[in-house]
Amino acid sequence: MVVASLSGNTRELGRMIAGHCRAAGHAVYWQEADAADPSEALAADQADLVLLGSWTDNAGRTPSEMKAWIAATAERGQRPAQVAVFGTGETQWGQEYYCGAVQRLIRYFNSTYPPLRIEQMPHGERHAAAIAEWTAAVLAHYWSTADADHQRHHA
């Protein structure tokens, strides 16, 4: 799991998702997109599934720290095969920009996984249910793919 979080909202969302993944028996390797030493994390191409979490910058853009992580991963030849994307955003800036980074990342990685978009900080039963349902859907989609390595259980 790679997370870019400005205010902590996306980080908290990632922690909640990681908890659901661990509860389902998956190993979760956590990395901040702007980590000074990314060598401690599992290489992106070694993970069965990479979960990318991002906040959205001005006008629906992907923040620079996530772009830098993607560029560094590509330079090392570690483009992940399977990517699911989640993020937080604010509708006050307009629906056309709301969680724009999520959509951009999905397009960039040609992800077939459903997106998860949460308004600001995840809270309450409605968000908890949406997060649990999304995580279950992502894991079900992962298990349905023909090229997944079901023995390693790395997310």
Predicted stretch roles:
Residues 3-6, 33, 88-90:
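Cofactor-binding loop segments of dinucleotide-utilizing enzymes, especially the Rossmann-like FAD-
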Residues 40-44:
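Short glycine-biased active-site loop of nucleotidyltransferases that positions the nucleotide triphosphate
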Residues 8, 37, 92:
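Flexible, glycine-rich phosphate/dinucleotide-binding loops
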Residues 12, 20, 24, 29, ...:
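FMN-binding flavodoxin-like domain, especially the glycine-rich phosphate-binding loop
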Residues 1-22:
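N-terminal beta1-alpha1 ligand-phosphate binding loop
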Residues 32-39:
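Short acidic loop-to-helix transition motifs that present clustered carboxylates
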